Amino acid sequence: MQEKVLVLDIDGTLTNSKKEITEATKQGIWNILQHGHKVILASGRPTPGMRKCEEELELKKYGGYLLSFNGARIVECKTGEVIYQRTLPLSIVPGLYEFAKANGCGLITYQGEGVISAFEPDKYVQLEARINGIPIQVVDDFVSYVDFDINKCLMTAPEEIAPELEKQLQEKYSDVASIYRSEPYFIEIMPKDVNKATSLDHMLEGMGLTRENAICCGDGYNDISMIEYAGTGVAMGNAQPAVKEAADYITGTNDEDGLVEVIDKFIMKPEKE
């Protein structure tokens, strides 16, 4: 049996449009875990925002990994240990603050179990906190307050202007950060050269496995790197067009148990042959 590593984005992939993991998806994941394969949840979410999915899938019992902040932190589920971490240079924070202020954007980072916001939360910052089930703390002086290690910042803007702002940020900070949108209104500011693919490569090497063992499934822009990297890259039926173009296979949507199709086709069926 060739060991497989199933790598799953959360929002729009593992969860349906109601932000739920269906029973069929849970059973499929438990089945492959019991057959000796591995599961990694890979998300732009902060680590606390992944805990509910970790608990629902019983990954502390079965084993698994949380690749959070788009790959800037990796946690082993059984031990809770942080096994890999990358941080942003704090020197970038004042410039991000001024840029966000000038363009009317939201700007947040993460501390402990919550979100730290530079301004009164807009609807996109509120959405980020709600999705992750974590509180928002608005601070008076964001630049002075952020004096701790940060895995990422998130800038929020209406989707009509976000692409242009993303481009400007990339031009300004490409030497120190990786910048890309995970949603039409979320601009991720990450440590340079950190994405889901680079962190996954680090993990697989530690496991003694290669990209050929990986089946990566996603729907958003921040999933493209790992979908292109994987031996088998899968786009959900609800994925952005650019994600589908990058994929080897397009499965059903997240409301059609698309992951069950992937598990059957690429893991369980080959095992029987």
Predicted regions and their residues:
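Mg2+-dependent phosphoryl-transfer enzymes with acidic/Ser/Thr/Gly-rich catalytic loops
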Residues: 1-5, 22, 188-273
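Active-site phosphate-binding/coordination module
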Residues: 23-123
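Asp-based phosphoryl-transfer active-site loop
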Residues: 4-18
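Non-catalytic pre-domain segments flanking phosphatase-related domains
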Residues: 1-8, 27-30, 34, 171
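Short, structured coil segments at secondary-structure junctions
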Residues: 57, 62, 70, 173-175, ...
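Short active-site oxyanion
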Residues: 36-40, 64, 152, 212-213, ...
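Residue-level signal for inorganic ion chemistry
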Residues: 32, 43, 70, 153, ...
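Conserved acidic, metal-coordinating active-site core of Asp-based
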Residues: 99, 103-217, 225
